[in-house]
């Protein structure tokens, strides 16, 4: 089977990761200690994508938990699913990274990284046919951002032909933890552009908006936000965990979603989003799911796709849905909103189906879109970065850990390049492409 090894780094990564494992354990009929007491064979059929079967009908997640301070780990261990994880797979330091990317990437993190890689190697050796890695982390902190990206590049070196998917929590415009977030995020994006195959961008502000506007929660907790993220992660990974009619794996997703290697930053959405008490008052239909899924208010990253165009997108439907209805609806969405899809990639909406819905729902859909409007997110971080970097504010925290200013300049220009690449493809049209092609043709002959 095609296994996935999961890494969670830093406080944010560990909390999202814990929520994810809680969600999928429930879907696969596992209790808090990993013992199977489900009812359906379908739950067991592809269990080993994420779980390793131990003795006594107990399943253990293929998860590696990493942090530079013991606090979050203790919280996970004390939580409802703390006994699920293999004790050797908790790898933590004592010092903390203090929201400093350089500490996570170069000093504190670098000391711990070999220990983590040993655990990753052991997990990979326990797989029949490893398809890739997924990592949950935030880009604004020290450990998740700095050490997370260090791990990604080390794993890339050792497993160059395996997929690398990241679920990255991007700093949001209004909700900020620390003042150096723009630095940490820019340095991280600089790494992700080169080393990740697919990055699912999530941001806290969009999650807050969804909680307040759609779920009618007055003061959402991080628990509520993480619950949303875990719903999306569970949706994106459905096809990998359950037999479906249209199965996909991380690589197929990437092939369908990434038209140019650098442009692999996706927006995600989930439907149906209904407040906790209101589930029983409405029936969900495929048209409703489709409409809600493509609604900008449902996107979990604070950029509005109406300001850009979709290069590609993918929808994963779960539950008892008719294939034909889904196809019709998706075609319908494309025809109605054709201006939001680039016309030089025909059929750029891909659909996958899985017959098993998430717990408590009849059907659901998860949306993954590669939209040029994600540049807003990078622009926003870039502007904040520039404002601080121009004055060299807070730089001594980074140079003190041995970083060079050059690295900041490089990261900044790499992010600006990324923004302009998105812009270039947003404006490209079919006819333009043909003319360029004709001009290039003779050159090949000359070579």
Swiss-Prot record:
A Gene Ontology molecular function term of the record: metal ion binding
Chain positions covered by the region annotation Disordered: 424-447
Residues where Mg(2+) binds: 69
Binding site for GTP: 11, 69, 138, 142-144, 204, 226
Biased composition (Acidic residues): 432-447
Top-rank lineage group of the source organism: Eukaryota
Example of a GO cellular component annotation carried by this entry: cytoplasm
Cofactor(s) of this protein: Mg(2+)
Keywords: Cytoplasm, Cytoskeleton, GTP-binding, Magnesium, Metal-binding, Microtubule, Nucleotide-binding
Subcellular location: Cytoplasm, Cytoskeleton
Gene3D superfamilies (alphabetical): Helix hairpin bin, Tubulin/FtsZ, C-terminal domain, Tubulin/FtsZ, GTPase domain
Family annotation (CDD domains): beta_tubulin (cd02187)
Main localization (coarse): cytoplasm
BP GO terms, sorted: microtubule-based process
Disulfide bonds: none
Family: Belongs to the tubulin family.
Subunit relationships: Dimer of alpha and beta chains. A typical microtubule is a hollow water-filled tube with an outer diameter of 25 nm and an inner diameter of 15 nM. Alpha-beta heterodimers associate head-to-tail to form protofilaments running lengthwise along the microtubule wall with the beta-tubulin subunit facing the microtubule plus end conferring a structural polarity. Microtubules usually have 13 protofilaments but different protofilament numbers can be found in some organisms and specialized cells.
Physiological role: Tubulin is the major constituent of microtubules, a cylinder consisting of laterally associated linear protofilaments composed of alpha- and beta-tubulin heterodimers. Microtubules grow by the addition of GTP-tubulin dimers to the microtubule end, where a stabilizing cap forms. Below the cap, tubulin dimers are in GDP-bound state, owing to GTPase activity of alpha-tubulin.
Designated name of the protein: Tubulin beta chain
């Amino acid at each position: 089977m095609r296994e996935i090894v999961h890494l969670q780094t830093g406080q944010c990564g560990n909390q999202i990761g814990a929520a994810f494992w809680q969600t999928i354990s429930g879907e696969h009929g596992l209790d808090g200690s990993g013992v199977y007491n489900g009812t359906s064979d379908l739950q067991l059929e592809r269990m080993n994508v994420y779980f390793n079967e131990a003795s006594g009908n107990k399943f253990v997640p293929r998860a590696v938990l990493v942090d530079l301070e013991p606090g979050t780990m203790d919280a996970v261990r004390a939580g409802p699913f703390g006994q699920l994880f293999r004790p050797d797979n908790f790898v933590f330091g004592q010092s903390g990274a203090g929201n400093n990317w350089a500490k996570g990437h170069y000093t504190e993190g670098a000391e711990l990284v070999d220990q983590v890689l040993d655990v990753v190697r052991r997990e990979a050796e326990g797989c029949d046919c490893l398809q890739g890695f997924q990592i949950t982390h935030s880009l604004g902190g020290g450990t998740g951002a700095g050490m997370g990206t260090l791990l990604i590049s080390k794993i890339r070196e050792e497993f160059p032909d395996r997929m690398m998917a990241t679920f990255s929590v991007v700093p949001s415009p209004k909700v900020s933890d620390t003042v150096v977030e723009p630095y940490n995020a820019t340095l991280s994006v600089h790494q992700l552009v080169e080393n990740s195959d697919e990055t699912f961008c999530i941001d806290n502000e969009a999650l807050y908006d969804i909680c307040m506007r759609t779920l009618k929660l007055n003061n959402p907790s991080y628990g509520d936000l993480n619950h949303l993220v875990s719903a999306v992660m569970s949706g994106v990974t459905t096809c990998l965990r359950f037999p479906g009619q249209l199965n996909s794996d991380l690589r197929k997703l990437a092939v369908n979603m990434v038209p140019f290697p650098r442009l692999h930053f996706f927006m995600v959405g989930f439907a149906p989003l209904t407040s906790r008490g209101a589930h029983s008052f409405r029936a969900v239909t495929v048209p409703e799911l489709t409409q809600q899924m493509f609604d900008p208010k449902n996107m979990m990253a604070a950029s509005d796709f109406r300001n850009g165009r979709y290069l590609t997108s993918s929808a994963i439907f779960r539950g008892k849905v008719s294939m034909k209805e889904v196809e019709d609806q998706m075609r319908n969405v494309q025809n109605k909103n054709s201006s939001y899809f680039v016309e030089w990639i025909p059929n750029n909406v891909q659909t996958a189906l899985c017959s098993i819905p998430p717990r408590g729902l009849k059907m659901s859909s998860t949306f993954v879109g590669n939209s040029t409007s994600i540049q807003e997110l990078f622009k926003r971080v870039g502007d904040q970065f520039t404002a601080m970097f121009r004055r060299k504010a807070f730089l001594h925290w980074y140079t003190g850990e041995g970083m060079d200013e050059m690295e900041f300049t490089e990261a900044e220009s790499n992010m600006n390049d990324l923004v302009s690449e998105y812009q270039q493809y947003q404006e490209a049209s079919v006819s333009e492409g043909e003319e360029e092609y004709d001009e290039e043709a003779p050159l090949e002959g000359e070579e």
